[in-house]
């Protein structure tokens, strides 16, 4: 088993630090101790890294080699995926498509943010309309700036979807740009 922090699990990550480039943690394990650096964002990814670390070590890979391998772990495309552009702010793409997923994503990113946290998002068309205002409220509560845009409207009017989302945000509280490319 594995865990974050103190406890009885044989594999533990302690002194966890969220940095703009990823996560840093001290590892305590039956195979020794070491420093884990993963270029992944969000503490949930630390649980994934611990699972991989334990599997590798139980398969005979040394702790040092396993830690080195995880330093280059790629993000799953569309899931807390970094878009690095020299001289530009840190941009993350995530497929958060439910209120809970959006909230967890923004909470995770807040730990890594060193400046203002922007949320550029939209809701898909022909899907649960009731969640749109809720997602707007969550974005408003957890981001410093919110920009509403189109996201696969299907048969719906993109502006109507944005208007639905905006009902969960205080008046004039979010920017709007229907053209997704322009919004990004």
Predicted regions and their residues:
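Nucleotide phosphate-binding/pyrophosphate-handling subdomain across enzymes
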Residues: 20-21, 30-145, 167, 172-174
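Short acidic-hydrophobic, aromatic-tinged amphipathic segments that line or gate anion-handling sites
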Residues: 175-179, 183
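Short loop/edge segments at beta-strand edges and connector loops
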Residues: 6, 84, 178-179
